[in-house]
Amino acid sequence: CVLWQHKGNGPKKLKIDKKKFIYLISPNKISGKFYQNLDKILVTGKVSFFQMRLKKYTLKQKISIGKKIKKICKKNKVKFIINDDPLLVSKLDADGCHLGQKDMNITIAKKLIGKKIIGITCHNSIDLAKKAIKAKARYIAFGSFFTYKTKKTKYLASIKILNKVKKFTKTPIVAIGGI
């Protein structure tokens, strides 16, 4: 994923080092030298956010994996984001949560995690982006920008939509999907 930041700040200032422009998402399966490889990537200083996205793991497994990832993220000054689960954000004391359109409502998520970061998927829709901005999402994500080899691409976004959205918001923008 690639992080775009418009000049200025979003609804609540989200400090983003301009040298750190990557929003990295975990693989579907954690195995082998994952933690060692993650540390090697994060130590480069190019990653702003790391999202733990583990759809097929139990809560107990996610907590165990999340504790290890959080430690690596903290050491490398990378924001640790949890996909879809504000309650897990609280359990792990992660930096925030990423919500898809079918996940929990941002208002409810804010009640659960307070002032932590909440980002919202907007697919390829300016209307969804406007709703997320109005709800005070700390960043908005568009995609997929490329087709996947592993799953069907439902929404295809383009640079054109990012340019349109940048004209009316200072909220940071993330390009996701197949990158």
Language-model-derived ranges and their functions:
Residues T150-K151:
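EAL-family c-di-GMP phosphodiesterase catalytic domain
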Residues C1-W4, G8-R138, K154, K164, ...:
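Conserved N-terminal beta1-alpha1 strand-loop-helix module at the mouth
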Residues I161:
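Conserved cofactor-binding/catalytic machinery of classical short-chain dehydrogenase/reductase
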Residues T147:
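Active-site micro-motifs of SAM-dependent methyltransferase domains
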